[in-house]
Amino acid sequence: MDMQNCTLCPRLCHVDRTKNYGVCHASDKVEIALVSLHQWEEPCLSGTNGAGTVFFSHCNMRCIFCQNHEISTEGKGFPVTIERLAQIFLEQQTRNAHCLELVTPTHYVLQIIEALKLAKKQGLSIPVVYNTSGYERVEVLEMLKDYIDVFLPDFKYYSPDTAKEFSHAPNYPQVVKEAIDKMFELVGKPQFKDNIMQKGVIIRHLILPWYYKESMEIVKYIWEKYHHDVYLSLMNQYTPMYKALTLSLIHI
């Protein structure tokens, strides 16, 4: 896989990112929007010191209700070299972050792997968390097997119609199921040290207004498939933002 024929995500744009943009609107140069110690992630990630988040610019999902649309859709951020990215990873460890959390990393996987190689050679040892929409290719996840400790995927939609309406991705439900299967295969059951997750999968689901039955289907699926072998993070902080402000169904 390379930037001149990009197939990193299920959109399969086949675009030359050195010259043009695909659905995610990202070039071949890594851009990041925010580096922080995040206190409000799941407690087993944030702990007392915070999760060392690195927010990447752009996104392959482009959900119409995105609460980070300035970063994901409008592309707020600045370019960094792979060497500088590796330094940022190490700086998060120096700040006593409990983990290094890569937020919306899918479209920069190739560069992130190179940066993680450099950082690990220089002593990066905290768990690396892959915070993703869940819209991932199994082949790309396989490339991450030696670099990611905790997968933090969304499971946004159960229905193809809902996925099409809100993210223009009708294949999302099938894709995310296969992706989570692969994530679990790669990291296995949850492992903890001092109440901080060292290995495992945490599945997030944001409950959308009027779509509670779909949420119930997702919870049922996760339980029947994984039982106690993954963690489920149900989120109720939906706020109508971005394009959702014009849609009566989810504008409350």
Question: What annotation goes with each model-predicted range?
Answer:
Residues 138-194:
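Aromatic-anchored, glycine/proline-accented short structural segments
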Residues 250-252:
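Conserved small/polar residues in nucleotide/adenosyl-binding loops
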Residues 72, 109, 134-137, 155-173, ...:
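Conserved radical SAM core fold
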Residues 128, 151, 201-203, 232:
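Hydrophobic/aromatic residues located in beta-strands of well-ordered beta-sheets
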Residues 167-169, 180-214, 218, 236-237:
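Conserved strand-turn element in the central/C-terminal portion of the radical SAM core barrel
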Residues 26-146, 150-151, 159-160:
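Conserved Radical SAM active-site core
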Residues 4-17, 21-25, 57-68:
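Local cysteine-cluster metal-coordination motifs and their immediate loop/turn environment
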Residues 89, 113-116, 141, 180, ...:
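Generic structural signal for well-ordered alpha-helices
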